[in-house]
Every structure is written in structure tokens, then in C-alpha cells.
């Protein structure tokens, strides 16, 4: 199988108090997540962000919970955080998702960009 080295997503904006599935594994694909860039757009408050690797639920996207959370990050005002595990996070099953939760209560969103490889 060939690897497509790419941004796995466009820049996603995740609103306050919401969760967004930013990467979903397609049929017969393997996804390797190398980095997640998270930027806090708020100039006055730290935003807490949760990263979830959520297994599929009968072939479709599952729901994030405390059992799927792999990181919780407090991103400072107007700051950017790079989540770069030593080895890529591998998602193999159709419908597996990377979900980002913005716990913020402010009105400001965060921006998220995911990079890695897609086996095609």
C-alpha cells in the first residue's frame, strides 16, 4: 500500500463547548496521525482542549468519553500547542475518529490542524 503524506484535514474551527470529529477513517484505509496543532483564538482566557481517539460504533462514528480521551491540554491565550506523540497514533477501522473537544465556556473557538499519513 502507498502512503499519502499530507495534512489529514483542513484547518477546523471548534466552537466553545463543542466536540468535532476532525478525522474519520474510511473503508480499507489506515490513518497515521503524526501531529495535532491547536491554536487558541481567545486573547483573554485559557481554553481546555480534550483529544479523543474514538473507535467506530457498528461501522459509524462513536461518541467521545473518558475512556477514549488520550490528552487534555490547557492552551494559553493566543497560543499554539503541538501534540506530537513519539510514534504515530494509528487508526485502522472504518469509522474510527479523532475527535477534538473545546471545553471552553468563552465564545471563542480554537483552530485545529492534523498532519500525518493515509495508507491508500
Where are these regions (language model features)?
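Short, surface-exposed beta-strand/strand-loop-strand elements in extracellular ectodomains
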Residues: 43-67
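Selective for proline/serine-rich intrinsically disordered segments
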Residues: 8, 53, 83-86
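Short beta-strand/loop motifs in extracellular/secreted proteins, especially
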Residues: 34, 45-50, 108-110
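Intrinsically disordered, low-complexity Pro/Gly/Ser/Thr-rich segments with frequent PxxP/GP/PP motifs
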Residues: 58-96
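C-terminal interaction-tip segments
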Residues: 1-31, 41, 55-57, 94-95, ...
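Short edge beta-strand/loop segments characteristic of extracellular beta-sandwich folds
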Residues: 37-39
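Short structured motifs
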Residues: 19-21, 35, 82-86
Amino acid at each position: 500500500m502507498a502512503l499519502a503524506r499530507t495534512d489529514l484535514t483542513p484547518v477546523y474551527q471548534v466552537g466553545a463547548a463543542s466536540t468535532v470529529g476532525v478525522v474519520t477513517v474510511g473503508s480499507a484505509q489506515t490513518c497515521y496521525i503524526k501531529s495535532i496543532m491547536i491554536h487558541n483564538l481567545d486573547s483573554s482566557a485559557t481554553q481546555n482542549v480534550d483529544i479523543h481517539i474514538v473507535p467506530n460504533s457498528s461501522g459509524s462514528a462513536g461518541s467521545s468519553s473518558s475512556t477514549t480521551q488520550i490528552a487534555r491540554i490547557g492552551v494559553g491565550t493566543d497560543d499554539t500547542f503541538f501534540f506530537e506523540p513519539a510514534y504515530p497514533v494509528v487508526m485502522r477501522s472504518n469509522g474510527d475518529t479523532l475527535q477534538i473537544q473545546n471545553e471552553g465556556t468563552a465564545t471563542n473557538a480554537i483552530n485545529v490542524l492534523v498532519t500525518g499519513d493515509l495508507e491508500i
